[in-house]
Curated annotation (Swiss-Prot):
InterPro entries per UniProt: Gustatory_rcpt
Topology Cytoplasmic: residue spans: 1-78, 133-164, 236-237, 326-334
Biological function: One of the few identified sugar gustatory receptors identified so far with glucose being its primary ligand and which mediates acceptance behavior.
Biological source species: Drosophila melanogaster
Transmembrane segments: 79-99, 112-132, 165-185, 215-235, 238-258, 305-325, 335-355
UniProt gene name: Gr61a
Extracellular face of the membrane: 100-111, 186-214, 259-304, 356-436
Membrane topology (UniProt): Multi-pass membrane protein
Name assigned to this protein: Gustatory receptor for sugar taste 61a
Amino acid sequence: MSRTSDDIRKHLKVRRQKQRAILAMRWRCAQGGLEFEQLDTFYGAIRPYLCVAQFFGIMPLSNIRSRDPQDVKFKVRSIGLAVTGLFLLLGGMKTLVGANILFTEGLNAKNIVGLVFLIVGMVNWLNFVGFARSWSHIMLPWSSVDILMLFPPYKRGKRSLRSKVNVLALSVVVLAVGDHMLYYASGYCSYSMHILQCHTNHSRITFGLYLEKEFSDIMFIMPFNIFSMCYGFWLNGAFTFLWNFMDIFIVMTSIGLAQRFQQFAARVGALEGRHVPEALWYDIRRDHIRLCELASLVEASMSNIVFVSCANNVYVICNQALAIFTKLRHPINYVYFWYSLIFLLARTSLVFMTASKIHDASLLPLRSLYLVPSDGWTQEVQRFADQLTSEFVGLSGYRLFCLTRKSLFGMLATLVTYELMLLQIDAKSHKGLRCA
């Protein structure tokens, strides 16, 4: 009997030592520094991408290179906000000049796409400034949740959060660069053939002449030279980067939240078939509240970004799909058109599918609760079950729509219906080569 008591005391002593070691490590991680940087946190996963984004005036945060998220703050008097202001000024001038040219020539469903692209870019710069202002209120609770769930009793996932973020983000970046290069290649080919067939007096066709036409809004206020061409590439690239980063940021955020909810579900699932004291259910329910509060905070801060992203993607898909049955002039035009359309569809689907994992993972603990025997169904279990089913957990666009699988297929059905209607309305003839 005494031997059994000694074994129990030793077991409890070892358990208390492990708990104290975990608490001490959590405390050191909460102070920032090397211990926190070595953890697989969401801040550590997205920090390299935020550093790159600041070169384009996105997410104007101070001390973004710091390993401690407590040092990263939004400041009005900062270099990051000054860079954002510069992009807003230059982008605003480009948008106004472009709008003036379009209104002079006459607006239609085809040429307004470029103006919408610029306006969406301006709105997104402002949206990311707003998100940067609430950064500290989001990232500090998120980091505390990361510290909580990267130690026992929670288990880490098979793949690290950083590897998931890197694979998806870098894949989108590489495909986006290809799309951007094909845009210029297709435009230059069309311009060259147009000059050859319509202006026989032009003996030389250079890329510079194409850029003068492509950046006509910039040449409207600047002389044509190497500086204005580089400026045009730079500003156009910034708008393109912002357009892609908007979706990448939603994807990265969705991966970060979904992974924590999956870890939480795994902890609850590990209790299946075991007698669980009410105190443990209380601890689990308290952790779930922290997770849901974090998800709600992120959803409220990102609603404008999600709304603009989905609305813009749907508009561009509709506009591009309208030209599916249009006979294009050159092979490079076909390559660019299909590459761009498929890439946009894939990127939009990626946004919905990754974001839907948040909601799916938040409901996983219900499976384990349904297996709790009736004699173990306590008041805490009932509260936890009510908590899981009481409200939606995930991302949305101002609560007008939620990013779920059902929303994705509903959007695709709407696109097909809308596209069929547009194809009936669009009665323009594309025959012949216009030499305007």
